[in-house]
């Protein structure tokens, strides 16, 4: 046998896939535990959802807004809108490369 044939034979043996070692049974997670954990997390999620819904309903019933509070909120929104529009116009005046802005 020629030396080159010996080398080719060695290469062929190295290319053969080696069987992968399976993890030991201790390392494998048991399938029975996963659904229980999912159920627990689901239950806690449902409980939290129900609790938050109850808190929200209580908050809505306890919140009685007077007309003064509503008018004050509307006035604040109007003031915010005016300031926003002023800023938009000033920016537009500084940089007129785009069309006139839409104001609210």
Swiss-Prot record:
Q: Which UniProt keywords apply?
A: Nucleus, Transcription, Transcription regulation
Would I find Transcription regulation among this entry's keywords?
yes
- One term of GO molecular function: WW domain binding
What Pfam families does this protein's entry cite?
Answer: BEX
Q: Does the keyword Hydrolase apply?
A: no
Q: Could you tell me where this protein is found in the cell?
A: Nucleus
Question: According to the UniProt record, where is the region Disordered?
Answer: 1-48
Signal peptide annotation: none
Regions of compositional bias (Acidic residues) in chain numbering: 32-41
The Gene Ontology CC terms held by the record are: nucleus
For bias type Basic and acidic residues, the affected ranges are: 9-31
The source's superkingdom equals: Eukaryota
Q: Which family does it belong to?
A: Belongs to the TFS-II family. TFA subfamily.
Query: What role does this protein play?
Result: May be involved in transcriptional regulation.
Q: What is this protein called?
A: Transcription elongation factor A protein-like 9
Q: Which organism was this protein described from? A: Mus musculus
């Amino acid at each position: 046998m020629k030396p080159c044939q010996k080398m080719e034979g060695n290469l062929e043996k190295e290319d053969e896939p080696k069987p992968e070692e399976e993890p030991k049974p201790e390392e494998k997670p048991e399938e029975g535990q996963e659904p229980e954990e999912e159920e627990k997390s689901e239950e806690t999620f449902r409980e939290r959802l129900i609790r938050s819904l109850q808190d929200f309903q209580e908050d809505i019933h306890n919140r009685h807004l007077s007309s003064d509070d509503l008018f004050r909120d509307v006035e604040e929104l109007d003031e915010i809108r005016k300031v926003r529009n002023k800023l938009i116009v000033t920016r537009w005046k500084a940089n007129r490369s785009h069309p006139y802005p839409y104001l609210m």
